[in-house]
């Protein structure tokens, strides 16, 4: 590869994107990736290169990794069928979440922004502060403002990290509420 940052060869452009995505600790946004190149790249061109890179990896014999888009951007990750093997590297127990935590998270995800009072009204019971703290420590929810009523209660909404952990690009990709209530969705830690 040439030493200049002005690359015109499509394969070299894809190689730069590939190495940046493979070595990044977190998903890269389109803005992050445009900064890789001295001449600002059009978003349409960048998306085309990412689509080609995704296809390149999918077309490999026995692909082990895949390029995915999540709420925070793009990242490479192991294909799901290799998860059981990778879990052996970190034999920590999968976190178990109480019914209260899962119900609270579901209410926030589907009805956001909501106050604790809204959650309590929907669930019919008081929300334990530890439930909210656990979801905030996990970086799945955050305070996004206050409702303009007496007492100005905090409004909670899900975070990009919540979407990233579920491999979702947006809340629109959540299953319909009816489906969610009928199935168990495993949440990796």
What kind of region is each of these model predictions?
Residues 1-17, 76-102, 137:
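Short alpha-helical segments that sit at the start of domains
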Residues 1-13, 161-189:
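Phosphate-centric recognition/catalysis
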Residues 27-36, 113-123:
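Short acidic, hydrophobic short linear motifs in intrinsically disordered regions
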Residues 54-67, 139-148:
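A short, conserved structural fragment
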Residues 41-52, 123-140, 150-153:
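Short amphipathic alpha-helical interaction segments
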Residues 10-26, 31, 104:
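Positively charged, polyanion-binding regions of nucleic-acid-associated proteins
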Residues 68-89, 145-168:
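Short, cationic-aromatic polyanion-contact patches
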Residues 20-29, 41, 110-115:
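Short capping segments at the starts of secondary-structure elements
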């Amino acid at each position: 590869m040439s030493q200049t940052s002005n690359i015109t060869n499509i394969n070299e452009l894809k190689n730069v994107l590939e190495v940046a995505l493979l070595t990044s600790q977190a998903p890269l946004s389109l803005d992050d990736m445009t900064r890789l190149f001295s001449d600002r790249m059009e978003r349409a061109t960048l998306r085309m290169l990412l689509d080609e890179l995704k296809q390149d990896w999918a077309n490999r014999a026995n692909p082990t990794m895949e390029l995915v888009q999540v709420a925070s951007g793009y990242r490479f990750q192991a294909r799901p069928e290799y998860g059981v093997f990778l879990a052996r590297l970190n034999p920590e127990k999968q976190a178990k979440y109480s019914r209260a935590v899962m119900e609270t998270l579901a209410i926030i995800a589907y009805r956001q922004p909501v106050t604790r009072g809204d959650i309590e009204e929907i669930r019919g019971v008081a929300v334990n502060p530890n439930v909210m703290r656990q979801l905030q420590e996990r970086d799945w929810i955050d305070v996004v403002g206050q409702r303009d009523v007496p007492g100005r209660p905090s409004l909670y909404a899900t975070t990009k990290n919540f979407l990233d952990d579920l491999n979702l690009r947006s809340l629109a990709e959540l299953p319909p509420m009816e489906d969610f209530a009928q199935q168990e969705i495993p949440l990796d830690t």
